[in-house]
UniProtKB/Swiss-Prot annotation:
May be a crucial component of the cytoskeleton of highly motile cells, functioning both in the invagination of large pieces of plasma membrane, as well as in forming protrusions of the plasma membrane involved in cell locomotion. In mycobacteria-infected macrophages, its retention on the phagosomal membrane prevents fusion between phagosomes and lysosomes. WD repeats lie at residues 13-63, 73-110, 123-160, 164-204, 207-251, 258-296, 302-349. This is Coronin-1A. Binds actin. Pfam families: DUF1899, Trimer_CC, WD40, WD40_4. It comes from Bos taurus. The modification N6-acetyllysine is found at K449.
């Protein structure tokens, strides 16, 4: 009798554990917008989620530990004049978050340690360049202050947030229709996009050239998502001609046929992929689903291995994904999701069961830390670098707030209307400076006199 050989994997028994009620964020009005975004962004300090708001766009930012019922009068980030569609935390500054909105603008905000005490209406910088709503914002993974935005004008802009200037533009000649998704490669050298024209493209953004593209990675008409995974591969989610949901793995050098193509079910929600490069696990979260599927990617056939599925009763309106440095390593937590319900946000921990309480080095290789490997100028000049890695063996403590430095004279934001804001000093400021200069000159003269008297005394002795 033949014996079936089961593939060995340390992630075969990963299981999901939803947080208890007192560890959730209750009574929040999650956005009803139909845009296919996660509507939630998390980091080791804060959880942010897009909310329903009257009179414009708003999103809520809470300190990670501030769980329980959220006060209905809690201060929010509310500078946009139309609904917010996407939010993303800066990977190199846990206090900085970017937002894209239907008002055609991108705004970058600085959140104080401890969270907001008053509504935040003035961004650090406003980035205006799109002519239609902005549905995607994505920070460069290794270069400081480099932010990408994609709008429904079919244009991708890459911004230097430090100057408020769009330094790169990929126009509608690259994407002739709506852009569904954009993902940076791990070193930030390339981006991967999916578009309504049913093509997935690999693009070198600094040159504006298409390195590779695949027409119809999935035969269906519903939106496709694409992300980079390990070893020069990309993973796509989409629909078959019969409207079955699919996941596929591709070698970017040979896009003729997929390395693996699997059909999942017939649900209609778009599958949002989240890839963990440390474990090579990809998690698929469908909007409107009540489950999270996860697969392991390997370097040998069949390449994409189904692991398991976490299921719950209520469907999800969105999902946030915690960076690895925000996990509890002493509990063997390898991923944590923040599931948006209609009126709450629920953390879900993905855990590998282990008997030992010691640090599990095989689960936690060195991971991307909070420091940038490059400046914006270095990356724009052609340099590439992988993320600067840190060890989680002794845990991770988020650093104190880092100031986001912006050259305000180049900021194109709407609030730069006063002379002080535009960089030109007022007459009052000039008068104060002149008075301080006179005082300094008088002090220097007095010190010089004292020094002369001291020298005369020394010479007399």
């Amino acid at each position: 009798m033949s014996r079936q050989v089961v593939r060995s994997s340390k992630f075969r028994h990963v299981f999901g554990q939803p947080a208890k009620a007192d560890q959730c964020y209750e009574d929040v009005r999650v956005s009803q917008n139909t845009w296919d975004s996660g509507f939630c962004a998390v980091n080791p300090k804060f959880v942010a989620l897009i909310c329903e708001a009257s009179g414009g766009g708003a999103f809520l930012v809470l300190p990670l530990g501030k769980t329980g019922r959220v006060d209905k009068n809690v201060p929010m980030v509310c500078g946009h004049t139309a609904p917010v569609l996407d939010i993303a935390w800066c990977p190199h500054n846990d206090n900085v978050i970017a937002s894209g909105s239907e008002d055609c603008s991108v705004m970058v905000w600085e959140i104080p340690d401890g969270g907001l005490t008053l509504p935040l209406r003035e961004p650090v910088v406003t980035l205006e360049g799109h002519t239609k709503r902005v549905g995607i914002v994505a920070w460069h993974p290794t270069a400081q202050n480099v932010l990408l935005s994609a709008g429904c004008d079919n244009v991708i802009l890459v911004w230097d947030v430090g100057t408020g200037v769009a330094v790169l533009t990929l126009g509608s000649d690259v994407h002739p229709d709506t852009i569904y998704s954009v993902d940076w490669s791990r070193d930030g050298a390339l981006i991967c996009t999916s578009c309504r024209d049913k093509r997935v493209r690999i693009i070198e953004p600094r040159k504006g050239t298409i390195v590779a593209e695949k027409d119809r990675p999935h035969e269906g008409t519903r939106p496709v998502r694409a992300v980079f995974v390990s070893d020069g591969k990309i993973l796509t989610t989409g629909f078959s001609r019969m409207s079955e949901r699919q996941v596929a793995l591709w070698d970017t050098k040979h896009l003729e046929e997929p390395l693996s193509l699997q059909e999942l079910d017939t649900s209609s929600g778009v599958l949002l992929p989240f890839f963990d490069p440390d474990t090579n696990i990809v998690y698929l979260c469908g909007k409107g689903d009540s489950s999270i599927r996860y697969f392991e990617i390997t370097s040998e056939a069949p390449f994409l291995h189904y692991l398991s599925m976490f299921s719950s009763k209520e469907s999800q309106r969105g999902m946030g994904y915690m960076p690895k440095r925000g996990l509890e390593v002493n509990k063997c937590e390898i991923a944590r999701f923040y599931k948006l319900h209609e009126r709450k946000c629920e953390p879900i921990a993905m855990t590998v069961p282990r008997k030992s309480d010691l640090f599990q080095e095989d689960l936690y290789p060195p991971t991307a830390g909070p420091d940038a490997a490059l400046t914006a100028e270095e990356w724009l000049g052609g340099r590439d670098a992988g993320p600067l890695l840190i060890s989680l063996k002794d845990g991770y403590v988020p650093p104190k707030s880092r100031e986001l430095r912006v050259n305000r004279g180049l900021d194109t934001g709407r609030k730069r209307t006063t002379p002080e804001a535009s960089g030109a000093p007022s007459s009052d400021a000039i008068s104060r400076l002149e008075e301080e200069m006179r005082k300094l000159q008088a002090t220097v003269q007095e010190l010089q006199k004292r020094l002369d008297r001291l020298e005369e005394t020394v010479q007399a002795k």
